[in-house]
């Protein structure tokens, strides 16, 4: 008999939520706010790490932004900007309509749901707290970001799984390189095929255009 799934590990962008929401809403919102945020928080160590003057810091943030940097300090600052936007009702996080039913099925069956994203853990928590379907925080057991390791390295998944049997974990992502790394660590994996995702040809992985068949 196949090993039953006890934990589902989910990516966010392109897996539970649309790439367009992140790229066309969250990222532009952050970029528009860098200068104002830095001006308000110039004395914070989390801002000073990027430079000594307002112009220098904003230039650095824009460079990191344009390069798609996964730098932890940068992602944390972005998360702080998004926190203000979520709390003020400027944005609500997008989720595909099959995500909430999956979360509820998992809860009913005692299957844990965890998140692993390049966005900071605080930003991940905001995403599920301020979703378009309401606060879904109670459905998420753990959150992981790149402080545990890059998503394309097998050791990151070993650290996440810990002493668990990796065969009881299912990782879903739209990124084949992440799936490769997770599979090397013994996890079950599946490719999220969502509207707006880049086409993937011959990945060799089970493909999920919908999560309705899971659990």
From Swiss-Prot:
One of its GO terms (molecular function) is acireductone synthase activity. GO terms for biological process: L-methionine salvage from methylthioadenosine. Binds 1 Mg(2+) ion per subunit. Its main location: cytoplasm. Keywords: Amino-acid biosynthesis, Cytoplasm, Hydrolase, Magnesium, Metal-binding, Methionine biosynthesis, Nucleus. Substrate binds at residues 117-118, 151. The keyword ATP-binding does not apply. It catalyses: 5-methylsulfanyl-2,3-dioxopentyl phosphate + H2O = 1,2-dihydroxy-5-(methylsulfanyl)pent-1-en-3-one + phosphate. It is an enzyme of class 3 (hydrolase). Pfam families: Hydrolase. GO terms for cellular component: cytoplasm; nucleus. Its cofactor is Mg(2+). Its EC number is 3.1.3.77. Monomer. Bifunctional enzyme that catalyzes the enolization of 2,3-diketo-5-methylthiopentyl-1-phosphate (DK-MTP-1-P) into the intermediate 2-hydroxy-3-keto-5-methylthiopentenyl-1-phosphate (HK-MTPenyl-1-P), which is then dephosphorylated to form the acireductone 1,2-dihydroxy-3-keto-5-methylthiopentene (DHK-MTPene). This is Enolase-phosphatase E1. The lineage of its organism: Eukaryota, Fungi, Dikarya, Ascomycota, Taphrinomycotina. The gene is utr4.
